Amino acid sequence: MSSSSLTTTSSMDSVVDGGLDTRLSLAVGCCPPRRRPVLLFGEVLPSPEKKVAAAAVVAAGKRGREQRGEAEAEATTTRQRRSCKKGRRGRGDDDDDDGDRRSPSGGGGDEEGASRKKLRLTGEQATLLEDSFRAHNILSHAEKQELAGKLGLSARQVEVWFQNRRARTKLKQTEADCDLLRRWCDHLAADNARLRRDLAELRRSSSSPPVSGLAVATPVVCPSCAHDDKRRLAFATAAAAAGDMASN
């Protein structure tokens, strides 16, 4: 009796456990839960080969970033140099009022690229350009087209040549004015020094006591004025002698 009751109880427990497992399987998704693999302590740490590979990847990424930074810096420097060259090349006169800075309507990138190159002229072309510049230093659009046809050049090249020629003329005029002002400044400085010396001599002569009554009666004359009087006297004597020779 007791053995049969135990068998019945165990069978009922197995049925209950089976039903519970079935319900859990249906609730989860008709599949039993997966067990996570157990990793040992040695398997958790990366191997030396993986460490070397990871270090190589990091070093390669760092080198790539450095190379990109150097390339960007070089590109920035190149752009700055090009912009400075364009600014120096495009600098011209500020008083151009005939639209010389504008490109001709029939031109294009080819003419602009050709105008940036150094223009080599023959003797006849240079002479004709100089004559045209002396006649009119600023040309209209029609005059530029006509002169370009005579020279066998583009209108843009003629325009750039006239701009550079005007800039050189203005620079030479400025240098000449500076030279003239420098000479005048030196001349005035010399006159100032001479007048200071004369003033010092006059002060010394006026402060010294008179030696005799004749010295008191003698007027005090500036040395430079006395020199001018002597020069005028010599000039008058030479003019009188020349007049006498002409009358004879």
Swiss-Prot record:
Leucine-zipper, as annotated region: 172-216
Alphabetical keyword list: DNA-binding, Homeobox, Nucleus, Transcription, Transcription regulation
Composition skew (Basic residues), residue ranges: 79-89
Entries under CDD domains matching the protein: homeodomain
GO CC annotation terms, alphabetical: nucleus
Residue spans binding DNA: 114-173
Highest taxon, organism lineage: Eukaryota
InterPro entries according to UniProt: HD, HD-ZIP_Homeobox_LZ_Class_II, Homeobox_CS, Homeodomain-like_sf, HTH_motif, Leu_zip_homeo
Subcellular location: Nucleus
Region feature Disordered, mapped onto this chain: 50-118
GO molecular function: DNA-binding transcription factor activity, RNA polymerase II-specific; sequence-specific DNA binding
UniProt similarity note: Belongs to the HD-ZIP homeobox family. Class II subfamily.
Purpose of the protein: Probable transcription factor.
Name of the featured protein: Putative homeobox-leucine zipper protein HOX26
Source organism of this protein record: Oryza sativa subsp. japonica
Gene name of this polypeptide: HOX26
